Amino acid sequence: MVKNLIFWLVITVVLMSVFQNFNSSDTSNHRVDYSTFLSEVNQDQVREAYINGRIISVTKKDSSKYITYIPINDPKLLDNLLTKNVKIVGEIPEEPSLLISIFISWFPMLLLIGVWIFFMRQMQMGGGKGAMSFGKSKARMLSEDQIQTTFADVAGCDEAKEEVSELVEYLKEPSRFQKLGGKIPKGILMVGPPGTGKTLLAKAIAGEAKVPFFTISGSDFVEMFVGVGASRVRDMFEHARKSAPCIIFIDEIDAVGRQRGAGLGGGHDEREQTLNQMLVEMDGFDGNEGVILIAATNRPDVLDPALLRPGRFDRQVIVALPDVRGRKQILKVHMRKVPLSEDVDPMIIARGTPGFSGADLANLVNEAALFAARFNNRVVSMIHFEKAKDKIMMGSERRSMVMSDFQKESTAYHEAGHVIIGRLVPDHDPAHKVTIIPRGQALGITFFLPESDILSISRQKLESQISTLYGGRLAEEIIYGSQNVSTGAFNDIKVATNLARNMVTQWGFSDKLGPLLYAEEEGEVFLGRSVAKAKHMSDETARIIDEEVKLLIEVNYNRARKILNENLDILHAMKDALIKYETIDSLQIDDLMERREVRKPKGWLEVDQKKDI
């Protein structure tokens, strides 16, 4: 930036000097022709003549001034001026040096050449952003000193760390493996849901192995020009071979490694050329000794089979969502820099966050710290973690949203219906918290929290979920009548319908159709799959599927209606508690379900006293 500024500053100064040289003559006076000047001299109208080369600055006796130019050498001019008593002032004209004359005459050409050289250098040395550097790799190389991440910073994925530890040992001591004839994997594909730590694990590998680390995103290869992607792949591997042993990390490789085929775009699009070049570089005629490729994706199903074969990606490392022990370890890592209260127990938080990824847990700790700072607390306590968890799971509170009394009551009945059905149907997750404070896009939320990590779901649990989903709509129908049911159950109906259809078509939970797969394969044409869809079922089978889905819904809908009709007193009591407290937790729900007096929420008295003051 500074060099560019200096360059243009020099150009500006030179241009100003040249134009000043061209316009150095005095142009403040108007110009007259030479014959007029001679005539005025003869008429005795001129008082003074200032001669500078061929330029004469004339001052008349009436004090007016002008300039004139001598077209040819006039030897009689001085005699005429002396005869008429004209004051003559002369000056020897300053002749420009030969170098300056040459420079002025050649300056336009030199300027064009300089500008051309400048732009060419910008194109070639513009940090990969110029037109001449389109084919250069955009991979950033991080040296061993720049990577501070180690395996100590990675938690919750012990199996994945164990899988890649051999890679680190090979990079440190390759001879130990080579003398036994062993070959280190050429490539490792890390697969897992978003936020589980795939990129972090790759950085830890490079940090532990102390080798150069090239990092690039899958979307950085392909751009608007044909052939750029393949050229960048070649350039990247060429630089990597010079730095071997080293690691190349490609994040989101599904952007460039998607399955080839006859999808939209044909078989000769730019992405496929890039993928073909990558396949050749990974396992072609030219060896890549010491160059290890690590890639990460959360869409392994869309990758090309040629990319996944042994010799290219020899290993697939699954980086799954952490279990309760893994979540505890991850929380401890992120809590290192946070001042914690004595009541904070990572295990309790880990048990209450099933399904959270490493990124979710990092966000949880950060949100808790922000809540503590907002309340001017010096340490982060469990209350802050609870508020942060509610915000992440249920969305931010919208207390500024104004709801009428009827809307509050209707929402309270709706959420109470979900809670009651969820508590009384078999094999359902316990209700953790229910609120009628608008959060996100919802007017109220009932949050069910599983007691442990869910690995598979039984048919009974699925049917219980369907019944619970319809509990809110049924509560409104029972209290206000079928004509006054609101649209608040739209999402509940959508989720319940999808569950029932999957039970029939994918999971084999239909007695009439049996354990067969009836769902049509949804091939995405942009992933190199066929545009045409084959129909895998007859019209009669499709009709039976619709009947079975409807039957599942009706059975569980009627079960939920019966449960609510038998527990109307609990429904009314829970509605009253929700309107009074706005949010109730699992302990208050227990009181309501046991038909006991509802205990007050923690801190309720303090809040109430503040309001009275």
From Swiss-Prot:
Ranges annotated as spanning the membrane: 5-25, 99-119
Q: Where, in residue ranges, is this chain on the Extracellular side?
A: 26-98
CDD domains (UniProt xref): RecA-like_FtsH
Gene3D superfamilies assigned:
1.10.8.60, 3.30.720.210, P-loop containing nucleotide triphosphate hydrolases (3.40.50.300), Peptidase M41 (1.20.58.760)
Compartment(s): Cell membrane
Q: EC number(s) per UniProt?
A: 3.4.24.-
On whether Coiled coil is a keyword of this UniProt record, the answer is no
The record's Gene Ontology biological-process terms are:
protein catabolic process; proteolysis
The record's listing under Pfam families reads: AAA, AAA_lid_3, FtsH_ext, Peptidase_M41
Q: Name one GO cellular component term.
A: plasma membrane
Residues that bind ATP:
192-199
Catalytic residues? 415
> Do you know which SMART domains this protein is assigned to?
AAA
Q: Give the enzyme's main class according to its UniProt record, as a single word.
A: hydrolase
GO terms, molecular function: ATP binding; ATP hydrolysis activity; ATP-dependent peptidase activity; metalloendopeptidase activity; zinc ion binding
Assigned keywords, A-Z: ATP-binding, Cell membrane, Hydrolase, Membrane, Metal-binding, Metalloprotease, Nucleotide-binding, Protease, Transmembrane, Transmembrane helix, Zinc
Q: Which InterPro entries match?
A: AAA+_ATPase, AAA_lid_3, ATPase_AAA_core, ATPase_AAA_CS, FtsH, P-loop_NTPase, Pept_M41_FtsH_extracell, Peptidase_M41
Could you confirm whether the keyword Nucleotide-binding appears in this record? yes
Binding partners and assembly: Homohexamer.
Identify the HAMAP family for this entry: FtsH
Biological role stated in the UniProt entry:
Acts as a processive, ATP-dependent zinc metallopeptidase for both cytoplasmic and membrane proteins. Plays a role in the quality control of integral membrane proteins.
Q: Which protein, by its recorded name, is this?
A: ATP-dependent zinc metalloprotease FtsH
**Organism source for this protein?**
Buchnera aphidicola subsp. Schizaphis graminum (strain Sg)
Phylogenetic lineage: Bacteria, Pseudomonadati, Pseudomonadota, Gammaproteobacteria, Enterobacterales
